[in-house]
């Protein structure tokens, strides 16, 4: 299981991304708009750079909801391969059965 601090850090990043998403999108739109003067676009870039680093969505990791494990993550189920195997073998995931042929 991942350390509690890592899981909490991830949750903090998720909150920051949600908080600054609209502001970040607006500044990016201004910075990309070629109809605006170069000075305004540059100011938008500077404001974007002053936002917190962790407010960028690229800083987020996918983590298992049950264990916090960042690797071997299944997006559809939001869990790692290890917990997926445990729950599936115990019959706790509806519709998932062990394959045999």
Curated annotation (Swiss-Prot):
UniProt keywords, alphabetically? Ribonucleoprotein, Ribosomal protein, RNA-binding, rRNA-binding
Q: Which GO molecular function entries does the Swiss-Prot or TrEMBL record give?
A: rRNA binding; structural constituent of ribosome
InterPro entries listed in its UniProt record:
Ribosomal_uS14, Ribosomal_uS14_bac/plastid, Ribosomal_uS14_CS
Give the UniProt entry's GO cellular component terms: cytoplasm; small ribosomal subunit
From the UniProt record, list the coiled-coil ranges: none
Gene3D superfamilies in UniProt: 1.10.287.1480
One GO biological-process annotation of the entry reads:
translation
What is stated as this protein's family in its record?
Belongs to the universal ribosomal protein uS14 family.
Subunit organization = Part of the 30S ribosomal subunit. Contacts proteins S3 and S10.
Q: What does this protein do?
A: Binds 16S rRNA, required for the assembly of 30S particles and may also be responsible for determining the conformation of the 16S rRNA at the A site.
Specify the protein name: Small ribosomal subunit protein uS14
Biological classification of the source: Bacteria, Pseudomonadati, Pseudomonadota, Alphaproteobacteria, Rhodobacterales
């Amino acid at each position: 299981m991942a350390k509690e601090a890592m899981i909490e850090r991830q949750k903090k990043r998720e909150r920051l991304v949600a908080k600054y998403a609209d502001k970040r999108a607006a500044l990016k739109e201004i910075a990309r708009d070629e109809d605006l003067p170069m000075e305004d676009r540059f100011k938008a870039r500077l404001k974007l750079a002053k936002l917190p680093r962790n407010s960028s969505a690229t800083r987020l990791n996918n983590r298992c909801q049950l264990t916090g494990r960042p690797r071997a993550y299944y997006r559809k189920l939001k869990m790692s391969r290890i917990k997926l195997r445990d729950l599936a073998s115990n019959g706790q995931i509806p519709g998932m059965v062990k394959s045999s042929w």
